[in-house]
Amino acid sequence: MITVANLTKSYGGQVLYQNGSFFIGPGEKVGLVGPNGAGKTSLFRLIMGEERADSGSIDYAKSLRICYFSQNVGELKGRSALEEVVHGNPRLGFLKTEISKIEKALEDGDYSDELLEKLGDYQTEFEKLGGYDIEYQAAEVLTGLGIMPEAHHRPVESFSGGWKMRIALAKVLAQKPEFILMDEPTNYLDVESIVWLEDWLRSFKGAVFMTSHDRDFMNGLVKKVVEVNHKTITVYSGNYDFYEKEREIRRDQLIASSERQQAMLQKEEEFIAKFAARASHAAQVQSRVKKLDKIERIEVMPEDMAINFEFPKPPRSGNDVVKMDSVGKVYATEEGKQKRVFAGVSGVVKRLERVAVVGVNGAGKSTLLKVIAGLTEATEGKAEIGANVQVGYFSQYSMDVLNPQKTVFEEVRDRVKDKSDGYMRNLLAAFLFRGDDVEKKVSVLSGGEKSRLILATILTNPCNLLILDEPTNHLDIRSREVLVEALKSFEGTILIVSHDRHFLKQLTTQVAEVNKGGVTFYPGSYSEYLSLAGGH
């Protein structure tokens, strides 16, 4: 279907990949992985013809229908959500217009063979592209991605950025192309929408090539992984978990080969040094010098090693960390109406519990966390923090407090008091800020880097109740693993909202489900909750 052969691409003096090759066949689901800046998005753009390679080729049939979902959705306006999705394929619009024109000509008595043949061709193509059921498909996909039927006819301008991303994703899916490129499709989706998308893609007969920070999503779909890293493209025949294990095995084998080669080279060099001045060995020395010149050195690229950082032990809180008694919350809408978020919420969160707060988008998860954190008042009832409880709170808005003019190190120094420079550098290293990274200005950091910076400072301050609202947003898989390990070692209580199932499965001891204006508590892990709920 798509053959990439000997691909080389560079920007300025930086080589992204050299002589990289891989193949994606019909119906294959393939993951694309690699560190930030390795060239994942560039590879998508090369396939789409939006960028040119330095050398090599990307070959596929001209008739192949390809769609590309990227994080840059452009400006959406002038249509309803449903109309935007229906108009995702301009060719369908053209065909519909031409068919209408021909049908009008037929009504006027023009029955020429040429016109009838053209009508037949247009109708065949229109049907092949799904034109006759596109509205049904568009509505089904929008609903699956969490935009309910009552919102289908709302103007796209009325949706927030995250919901516009869903509309843009729906535009791609509803076209049912033969090949889909997807750059982080699970961003901004809740768990229910991610599960729906995973099921949809699993039954999709076309090929998919995608990046995703959601490990469970990748594991559930892909059977092949393409890695871009260290200027090379490497293919692994398995899901994400297989890729991680196989990558480690291959690296160990490479290190062993490199060590054997180094031992051999050292012996040869010792021989050359020992006999270089002896005329009787001149031929042998010359032969071995030539041999060494021809040997291609095995290069083992440096890997970021995990940093063992011991977070400070928080002060002990009382056993009852959070108490809620008939808590309710009502908001005033822009139209001046009252909107109830939840009511009658009662419960106690005990010390050392790790509670996942779950529910569909708009159910009130973030509002519940804000009420508990004291950032907004309950309209009814009472939410109380227990004795000796100190709160650390994180949300996507926490990043707004960062000073864009300061460096990463300066931000940490200002927020982590009475600690040495070495301590702060180790802290930053544990959150993947290493070497020159600590001197980066906050203004140039990505969303994921800003999240890591804030989380690092929260975890090293003496709080014993962490309230985390979507801490995994913008974090890649490696950063999420770093955060999981940090939270596992945290000797306090955690309330957390996240749409990453793998992340929640590793952490939680209790689940609070916000649904239909109430909250239900389920003892046990997130995996046990999913089993009860019939989830994935």
Where in the sequence are the language-model features?
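ABC ATP-binding cassette signature C-motif
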Residues: 1-258, 305, 314-536
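Intracellular alpha-helical coupling/juxtamembrane segments of multi-pass membrane proteins
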Residues: 246-302
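Conserved short loop/turn motifs at secondary-structure junctions
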Residues: 157, 275-278, 312
